[in-house]
Amino acid sequence: MRETYRRTLQQRIAKRRGLALNTKPNQSISKAVIEFIRSTVVRPIHMLVTEPIVGFVCLLTSFQFGLLYIFVVASPWTFETTYGFSLGAQGLTFSGFIVGTMFSYAAIIAGDRFLYQRKLHQFEHEHQAPGTATEFPPEHRLYNAMLGSLILPSGLFMFAWTAEYAIYWVVPIVAQAITIFGSIQIYVPVSMYMVDTYGPLYGASAAGASSLSRYTLSAVSLLFTLQMFKSLGTGWATSLLGFCALTMAPIPWVFYRWGPMLRARSKYEREL
């Protein structure tokens, strides 16, 4: 892949032309360690708590990641207790996730090809005149996420109330496929939206905040998933997740509508 980071490109150009590189003076080890901690730990946490875009994107991505781990634990238990599936048959129930994942990435590619790229070419055509240099709004990344915000709760509620002995076992597997489809439709676009918003430098810190939050929630979710499903039953335990997804469904739509205002108020200037 071609290098796209501006500072690296500038350094390469300067080196080819024999120009002096604008490098920082040698730092002591202690200052280098402090700078490393600041950029890899302090900044991501600061962005997580002070930047609305980072905070809500981390909330969305953490929920999607945690949802995957929850189903890894809850799905085998559900099909064992409801349908009497053996250990080997329980593994086959994840075929819904495989199918849903395949269709989800196909939809993301289609959304990029027929929506995002079309909007990008239209924007470049309209702003190609001299003096009209303007950044392409990253909100156009959110089309698939807005679709996924409607599909995810539907899949969760469908799984919640079709995972019953009287209903054929294929139906909840289809519900799982719909759930993972909607989840990936949210996860990938909002992550790309956040990186596009902050650029390569601060986008890396924002991605670090996302990693911190989603792995923390994923680890915690494993501690209560089985107990929650045993106490509430598959119907109400999954419905609880559905209500959480329904509560977070407006977030991509809010970003699409008010994202420019939030970006304008950001304390972190985007680096190209």
Descriptions of predicted regions:
Residues 50, 54-58, 166-170:
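Primarily residues marking transmembrane-helix entry/exit sites
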Residues 11-12, 59-60, 172, 251-252:
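Short coil/turn segments at secondary-structure boundaries
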Residues 1-55, 105-126, 254-272:
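Central mid-sequence intracellular linker of multi-pass
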Residues 51, 61-62, 209:
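Short acidic/histidine-centered micro-motifs embedded in hydrophobic/aromatic stretches
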Residues 65, 69-70, 76-272:
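C-terminal transmembrane bundle
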Residues 56-62, 66:
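A single, central transmembrane helix in multi-pass transporters
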